[in-house]
Swiss-Prot record:
Its EC number is 5.2.1.8. This is Peptidyl-prolyl cis-trans isomerase. PPIases accelerate the folding of proteins. It catalyzes the cis-trans isomerization of proline imidic peptide bonds in oligopeptides. Gene3D superfamilies: Cyclophilin-like. It comes from Helicobacter pylori (strain ATCC 700392 / 26695) (Campylobacter pylori).
Length: 163
């Protein structure tokens, strides 16, 4: 049976307080700007799960050089999620899958849950299919991304209203 769709009602002013995220990994920190105006459900979901500690200690279970580093599966296999799913936000989302983008992983339209991926390179064939909800903000973050290997650990995710 498919998990139920979850809809968040977090106000934009509240999301603005979490406009920047840092994914702390065993390879270093990856600072992100989150596109809360373009993908409010994806950002609300990511922020809520992260604040609950959902991502703490999970691994990057799928890392493909020249493609993506994917994490957020509670089983570390790519088969799990948070027990709910969210709708894709692609129709009015101007953001593209560029090097350093963070996007929702899913197994088909409106099946995203907790899994996300970071793009090693531009991936235009994913535009309109997956919800881009942020981007890496610094060369340092991109350098850390390039060091991520399969099995590396997401230690925690923290948020702030500014860089």
């Amino acid at each position: 049976m498919m998990d139920p769709i979850k809809t968040y009602e977090i106000k934009e002013e509240e999301l603005a307080k979490t406009a920047y995220a840092t994914i702390k990994t065993n390879k270093g920190n990856i600072a992100l700007e989150l596109f809360y105006k373009d993908a409010p459900q994806a950002v609300s979901n990511f922020v809520t799960l992260a604040k609950e500690g959902f991502y703490n200690g999970l691994n990057f279970h799928r890392v493909i050089a020249g493609f993506v580093a994917q994490g957020g599966c509670p089983y570390g296999t790519g088969t799990g999620g948070p027990g709910h799913r969210i709708k894709c936000e692609v129709a009015h989302n101007p953001n593209k899958h560029k090097r350093g983008s963070i996007s929702m992983a899913h197994a088909g339209r409106d099946t995203g849950g907790s899994q996300f991926f970071l793009c090693f390179v531009d991936l235009p064939h994913l535009d309109g299919e997956h919800t881009v909800f942020g981007k890496i903000t610094s060369a340092e973050g991109l350098s850390v991304l390039d060091k991520i290997k399969q099995g590396d650990i997401i230690e925690s995710v923290v948020f702030s209203s500014s860089l």
